[in-house]
Regions:
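A conserved beta-strand/loop capping segment in the N-terminal third of enzymes
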Residues: 50-102
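N-terminal Rossmann-fold NAD(P) dinucleotide-binding loop
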Residues: 14-15
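Predominantly flavin-linked oxidoreductase catalytic cores and closely associated redox partners
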Residues: 104-238
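Beta1/beta-strand and adjacent pyrophosphate-binding region of the FAD-binding site
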Residues: 1-11
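Glycine-rich FAD pyrophosphate-binding loop
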Residues: 8, 22-42
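FAD/FMN-dependent oxidoreductases across multiple families
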Residues: 137, 216-301
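C-terminal helical "tail/cap" subdomain of flavin- and related membrane-associated enzymes
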Residues: 300-367
Length: 367
């Protein structure tokens, strides 16, 4: 028997929309390409609005080991500014968060099909059929595309507004003194051509996530080791955080051609959520919130029998402003003059950083 809904992708958006739909009694099948818990190339900042969406799904962030974040430190060359966040926030690994959402979806009755990728997704006689990599097909009345930064054949996103970034992510087991120094902080290191974020997640692990423009990475011979060495030489604080630390894997996770600034505003067929609907620059820390917002909104519109086109248009209205602001700031942040201007302004008006953080959040009246 066909499912009511196919969800392609079991990340934040996919797990959340599956939970919402299954809780409402729909027969949901989730296709997730990884067979078990895994890390993903992204920051792991859970903003206040994201935390509320998770509480609505009965997910206990602190029970999962999430670390409270109250303050941001920004470093550029030999400068540093500090700002308090005006909203409650947490840091939690995607490994833990994604699994919690999939467990919740499963608890409500969603069926999980793990370890297989969707090779294609296509309409068929008023329904949707997903062909998996082992040849099996799944049929459903509706489909949600939630594959994050990875596209499904036939549904490739157009470019964003800033497409030349390469992303890296590596977890580190830091020494106790540096974990204490980092506790309750998220640190942002801006450098010509990119920026890096560092924060604690659960179990005393620090997440180092960064993006760098392709041509800047090429100047370093496309070498992760050279990039990390350069950053540690340029930022004493980062060098201190990683002193004595052990990387949790041999190599960082990596991804290229991130379509920052992309927003889907029309019905292309499947319901697009998460990064398939909007890609906000990583420094904003609001990607998880957008994923959860799109999942809840998509589920509400689907359950109410509203058209996909209405949903995509509403979601675009909700997030376009913040994505546009964040993309503009991202373009400024990767340039030396932009870094100097922002750091200088922040020293004169310390609330500037808090104001920027507010501008890159989903507006309260849209939640």
């Amino acid at each position: 028997m066909p499912a009511d809904v196919l969800v392609i992708g079991g990340g934040v958006a996919g797990g959340a929309v599956a939970a919402h739909l299954a809780r409402a009694g729909r027969h949901v099948v989730v296709i997730e390409r990884k067979s078990g818990p895994h890390d993903k190339v992204c920051g792991e900042f859970v903003s206040g609005e994201a935390a509320q969406y998770l509480r609505d799904l009965d997910i206990d962030l602190e029970g999962l080991g999430a670390v409270r974040i109250t303050t941001v430190r920004i470093y550029a060359r030999h400068q540093m500014v500090t700002a308090s966040l005006r909203f409650p926030a947490f840091s939690l690994s995607r490994r833990a968060l994604d699994e919690a959402l999939l467990r919740t979806a499963s608890k409500y009755g969603a069926q999980l099909r793990r370890g297989h990728s969707a090779r294609s997704l296509r309409p068929l006689g008023g329904q949707w059929v997903a062909e998996l990599d082992h040849g099996r097909n799944f049929l459903a009345g509706g489909s949600f595309l939630a594959t994050g930064k990875h596209d499904v054949r036939g549904w490739r996103r157009p470019p964003g507004k800033q497409n030349d970034f390469i992303g890296f992510k590596l977890h580190w087991r830091v020494v106790a003194a540096q974990a204490a120094a980092l506790s309750s902080y998220v640190e942002l290191f801006v450098f010509p051509g990119g920026y890096a974020g560092l924060s604690l997640v659960e179990n005393g692990i620090a997440n180092l996530c960064l993006v760098i423009r392709r041509h800047s990475f090429e100047r370093l011979d496309n070498s992760w080791e050279a990039l990390l060495t350069t950053l540690r030489a340029d930022f004493l604080a980062l060098h201190q955080r990683l002193s004595g630390a052990e990387p949790c894997s041999d190599r960082p996770l990596a991804i290229a051609s991130i379509p920052y600034g992309y927003v889907q505003s029309r019905n292309i067929g499947p319901w697009c959520i998460g990064d398939q609907a909007a890609v906000i620059p990583s420094f904003s820390g609001d990607g998880i919130a957008i994923a959860l917002h799109s999942a809840r909104l998509g589920a509400e519109y689907y359950l109410a029998g509203k058209a996909n086109s209405e949903f995509q248009a509403r979601l675009a209205r909700d997030v376009t402003g913040q994505v546009r602001v964040a993309t503009l700031l991202s373009r400024v942040l990767v340039k030396r003059w932009g870094q100097d201007a922002i750091m200088g302004a922040a020293r004169v008006a310390p609330r500037l950083i808090s104001d920027i953080a507010d501008l890159t959040r989903i507006p309260n009246d849209r939640l």
